[in-house]
From Swiss-Prot:
Domain named MIT: residues: 1-84
Record's protein name: Calpain-like protease palB
Source organism: Emericella nidulans (strain FGSC A4 / ATCC 38163 / CBS 112.46 / NRRL 194 / M139)
Function: Required for the proteolytic cleavage of the transcription factor pacC in response to alkaline ambient pH. Probably is the signaling protease that mediates the first proteolytic cleavage within the signaling protease box of pacC, yielding the 53 kDa 'open' conformation intermediate protein, which is committed to further processing. Required for virulence in invasive pulmonary aspergillosis (IPA).
GO biological process: cellular response to pH; penicillin biosynthetic process; positive regulation of penicillin biosynthetic process; proteolysis; regulation of secondary metabolite biosynthetic process
Alphabetical list of PANTHER family matching this protein: CALPAIN-7
Length: 847
């Protein structure tokens, strides 16, 4: 009975304690933080008094002690903010729980093979037996093959040596022999020397500084074996070490031995701690990472990617020179998270000239670690560390004076304070790695994108992987796209890997999209193997995330896309809006590149008939092979026949303005019938191939229509000229045998004097005989005059031979020039017959 009555009160007390914890983090003064910490401890104490569960008692007792200790530290610490904001240093990392498909299992297995080694998915922490020596205790573990060294490194290479060999003969300050250790007390000073892995060293500087600020007593990444009942790394008796790194879609097991490349000179071939020469943890982490990246010849990547692999923390890249980035925004976004230990910060320069490097004291295309952030009296500064051992101790141009921090500890060489505004001015990229534990839920999808079948058009997403993202409660959702690392076959292939770009586009709806137009969010194209999209979405909303690329190697590549959120989130392959998709290929050639609808040759463009038996929604996507071509699509109501001229009443839908990267027509509830699709480039004589995708909700037939001249014999007349005051001319038309004929009259030139003008409205008729008893056999445009830029047409009619006795058959062109007209028109007629026909000379009738 008492348990039932106390439960609500206990729950209420815990809720108040959690609120007090949040108040500690957001406190604006030391006294507010202290009061909130005491409040949290008191509420946990009261909840502890009400519990009867031994498990709950242990948890609540630990929380009481934690917050009492925190309150004492806040009260006695000058840097009370760091203490107050360290609540989230240890959060549970979420994990995807959706069941993988067989194909996804295969993708993860493929990702295990990398650069000649096998890195299986992580299953569990290794047992201590994995690190035991042989029966006699003298068999040390040796990993084969040895990691690759560059030619420069080989010049000073003195062999692979165990830590005790490297430290042989060295003593500490007290004269005692140095023995290798995996943990140290006091601050570290990690640096690179010969190796070009500044990004790796900067990454480890960021993780060690987090521990040194008191946010976590465990170094990241964790190295096994560990000291009993802790996550602190220990010396392996066998020289075997195991790492849990995140890459190629999951956490994986990386195994190395403790042999490191020794040097013939004073230069070091591995990362060192200048404060603790016997601290082997950095060099072993470096070796494990370089193993999966292909060896010690590794040219470097960026520290955001390296930290992602080393820790599994979510990478984000901020372009500091973007117009959207401000010092206020950067500082407000990062300050609290940094001091609570939820984000690791590194930073990189862009390409600098030698003069700029000398004047600024910065290294070109180099990564630095951010060790601390301080704000006092309106001054905001970053503590930055250059991981290169050869750096100078002071940077005259950028070294900030102690200013508001006169009691700052001694800075090691290469470490300096810099104002936030100067950071944005002199660095190019800020790399953030977020603790995934700030989210409660994660869901992953692993997929393959086959880029070997040809490059997709920029802005056309018909072939791109697309995903539906749904959240019931809404709120913050982060989407992380990761490209899987591949084996480096050569330095050239490595360059290909490094210079591809990936991005994420986000649309409403959750269904597949065809073009980039209408995106809610467009991520930047980054040359990293990862990119992050941050969303804030309303409840019960579904979005489409599209994966895009530029210049990736034209091979099949594996990816993982992950969704992170504080509430359950679902991610799946985006369904198509349409049931049936028909793919047709064609091209614009010298005879079919007719240009836009204002061109006289528009009707020559490729045309397609589409037959619909029932009402349906329809999508038509035109994807040219040349991304520089601006294209357009029109859908006509035409009975499925070729379009000879463009009339607005016949247009059902079109793609709008001409655009590069593909064109899209969408129409809802299109009636049954036969329609014609015309695809065009902006200007005539622009050649190239294309793919036409027609998507509907019913089965449909799409066929390319033959050209007007297909199967016909074409004959061109001489050019007939109507001078001012002349409005009618005619030419005889004959055939040796019965045939079907189509006539097309086109303007070749119209002018007033020397000034070009549009053609006069024209009517073309086919007449038997002349004079009062003539007979009209066929006429253009239903008997109306037309100034259509594509010309006027007389559709198919039967032409018989031997009609000369009845006055002959005549092609008659009659224009509306009006009395005193000043226009001079030049016309040409093309006859398309099943048999050859002849067109005689033009006879011009005076007004």
């Amino acid at each position: 009975m008492s348990r039932t009555s106390s439960a609500p009160s206990q729950k209420s007390l815990i809720s108040r304690a959690l609120k007090a914890e949040r108040d500690v983090i957001t406190a604006s003064s030391q006294s507010q933080a202290l009061d909130a910490a005491i409040d949290a401890a008191e509420h946990y104490m009261k909840a502890l008094a009400l519990t009867s569960s031994s498990k709950d008692r242990n948890v609540l007792d630990a929380k009481c002690k934690e917050w009492l200790t925190r309150a004492e530290k806040i009260k006695g610490s000058e840097d009370w903010r760091s203490v107050a904001q360290s609540r989230r240093s240890r959060l549970r990392t979420p994990a995807s729980t959706r069941k993988l498909t067989t194909r996804e299992d295969i993708i993860l297995l493929q990702g295990a093979k990398l650069n000649g080694f096998i890195f299986p998915p992580w299953k569990a922490e290794p047992s201590l037996t994995e690190f035991e020596t042989g029966t006699n205790g003298d068999v040390l573990f040796t990993d084969k093959p040895d990691l690759h060294l560059s030619n420069l490194q080989r010049d000073i290479f003195a062999g692979w040596k165990r830590p005790h060999e490297l430290l042989s003969g060295q003593v500490d300050d007290a004269g005692m022999p140095l023995n290798p250790v995996m943990t140290v007390s006091g601050n570290t000073d990690l640096v690179q020397d010969v190796l070009t892995d500044c990004s790796v060293v900067a990454s480890l500087c960021a993780t060690t500084s987090r521990s040194e600020r008191g946010l976590d007593d465990t170094l990241l990444p964790i190295v096994y074996p560990c000291i009993h009942n802790s996550m602190k790394s220990d010396i392996s008796p066998s020289g075997k070490y195991i790492f849990r790194f995140y890459f190629n879609g999951c956490f994986r097991k990386v195994v190395i031995d403790d042999r490191l490349p020794s040097s013939k000179t004073s230069r070091s071939l591995y990362m060192i701690d200048r404060n603790h020469r016997n601290f082997m943890w950095p060099a072993l982490v470096e070796k494990a990472y370089l193993k999966l990246r292909g060896g010690y010849e590794f040219p470097g990547s960026n520290s955001g990617t390296d930290l992602w692999v080393l820790t599994g923390w979510i990478p984000e890249q901020v372009f500091l020179h973007s117009d959207e980035v401000t010092a206020d925004q950067i500082w407000s976004d990062l300050f609290k998270s940094f001091h609570s230990g939820d984000v690791l910060l590194t930073i990189g320069t862009g390409k600098l000239t030698e003069r700029e490097q000398k004047e600024l004291g910065l290294v070109s295309e180099h990564d630095y670690a951010i060790l601390d952030m301080k704000e006092l009296k309106g001054r905001r500064q970053f503590l930055i560390k250059n991981p290169w051992a050869g750096t100078d101790a002071v940077y005259p141009a950028l070294f900030a004076d102690p200013g508001p921090f006169p009691n700052s500890p001694f800075l090691s060489p290469g470490t300096f304070w810099m104002d936030c505004e100067m950071v944005l001015q002199n660095f190019e990229n800020l790399y953030l790695n977020w603790n995934p534990g700030i989210f409660a839920y994660q869901e992953d999808i692993h997929f393959t994108w086959d880029l070997s079948t040809g490059k997709g058009m920029a802005g056309c997403f018909v072939k791109n992987p697309q995903f539906s993202v749904y959240t019931e409660r809404g709120g913050v959702v982060w989407l992380l796209l990761g490209r899987h690392l591949r084996t480096i076959e050569s330095r050239a292939s490595e360059e290909d890997e490094r210079f591809g770009f990936i991005s994420i586009y986000v649309f409403k709806g959750g269904k597949r999209v065809a073009l980039s137009d209408g995106a809610l969010h467009r991520g930047p194209y980054v040359d990293s193997p990862n990119t992050l999209m941050k969303l804030d979405v309303p409840p019960r909303s579904t979005y489409t995330a599209v994966v895009s690329e530029e210049s990736l190697p034209r091979v099949s590549q594996n990816f993982t896309i992950s969704a992170f959120s504080d509430s359950p989130v679902r991610i799946s392959h985006a369904p198509n809006k349409y049931i049936c998709v028909t793919k047709v290929q064609g091209s614009w050639t010298p005879t079919t590149a007719g240009g836009n609808a204002e061109s006289a040759r528009y009707s020559l463009n490729p045309q397609f008939s589409i037959v619909l038996s029932d009402p349906t929604d329809i999508s038509i996507v035109l994807e040219p092979s040349d991304q520089e071509l601006a294209t357009h699509v029109k859908l006509f109501w035409s009975g499925g026949k070729r379009i000879a001229r463009v009339r607005s009443r016949d247009i059902v839908a079109d793609s709008g303005d001409y655009r590069r990267g593909g064109s899209l027509v969408e129409k809802q509830d299109l009636d049954p019938g036969e329609y014609t699709i015309v695809v065009s480039t902006f200007a005539p004589d622009q050649y190239g191939s294309f793919t036409l995708w027609v998507s509907t909700n019913i089965t449909c037939e799409v066929t390319q229509l033959p050209s007007e001249a297909a199967g016909r014999r074409a004959v061109l007349s001489d050019i007939g000229v109507l001078l001012p005051g002349q409005d009618r001319m005619l030419a005889p038309l004959t055939t040796p045998r019965l045939t079907r004929v189509k006539l097309i009259a086109r303007s070749r030139e119209s002018r007033i004097g020397n000034r070009p003008v549009g053609p006069s409205p024209l009517l073309m008729t086919v007449e038997l005989g002349q004079g009062p008893y003539k007979e009209i056999l066929a006429t253009s445009e239903d008997g109306d005059h037309s100034d259509s830029i594509s010309g006027v047409r007389v559709e198919d009619f039967d032409l018989q031979p031997g009609l000369e006795e009845r006055g002959g058959v005549w092609i008659v062109l009659e224009r509306i020039g009006g009395p005193g007209g000043q226009v001079e028109d030049h016309f040409e007629v093309e006859a398309l017959g099943e048999e050859r026909v002849e067109i005689g000379e033009w006879i011009v009738e005076d007004a």
